[in-house]
Amino acid sequence: LIKIQTKSILAKTAVVISLCALCSSVFAAPTSKGLTKSEELYPQGWTVGDQIKFKKGTTASLNDNGAVISGVLASDTYLRPQGWQRIINDYYFVSAYTNRSPFFPRYYRYWNNNSTYNIALSSYGHIRYKGGTAVTFSEQGTVLNGTIADETTVGLGSEKYGFIAFKSGTILDFYNDGAVKKGTLAEDTKLRPVGWQNNAVDMENAGFVEFKGKSIVSFTPDGEVTNCTVKEPLKWKDNGVEIELPGGSIINFTEQGA
């Protein structure tokens, strides 16, 4: 009987140890690596062994495989954002110099009077992220958030028409499904806030509200505004009561009102 009980206890102990080991591997916390020099590292989620250079004097967050979850770029770098399928202006220009007139049938060329010409090449869903700023990679290897170096136009809805230009030098943040989560408007833009169906007073505008350029905007996964700066005074409902929101103010929108 004692032997049986001992074996039972040992078996239970082994199970507990195995479960603990499994949990520790599944829920392993990211580790930090201080960079004493600019260093090339592998981002998480990449299936090809390309490296990105991260900036000296910063700290990179690594997963349990030693791949980068987040870090500070050493220089401007083209990367694919999480919502890369929705990127509209996915091209970039390169310059070339010649004394003759070559023919490139596949690419658009902008000519000037000198021996210099520019060619627009597809970036295949990549956008340029600003050097000296932090980026965070998803488990698929795309960028969840980072500072864009150029003005970037993104489709707002996955199955609906509509595009937004986001300001260069600002942070662009994506949901895991690729929808835009947060960014800075490059220009005045008309968008629909959360709860517009029940709270918009003037339906002549079909629920659209004009938001101020260069202001930070936050979206639901469906592309409705939860927070931004309204350009003009706005008549809206809050818990069924009609109110007027001051122009130039940051407004938080909910299903119940503002």
Model-derived features: positions:
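Terminal low-complexity interaction tails
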Residues: L1-I2, T254
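Bacterial N-terminal signal peptides that target proteins for export
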Residues: I2-V15
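Glycine/tyrosine- and acidic-biased, solvent-exposed loop/turn segments at the edges of beta-strands
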Residues: A28-A258
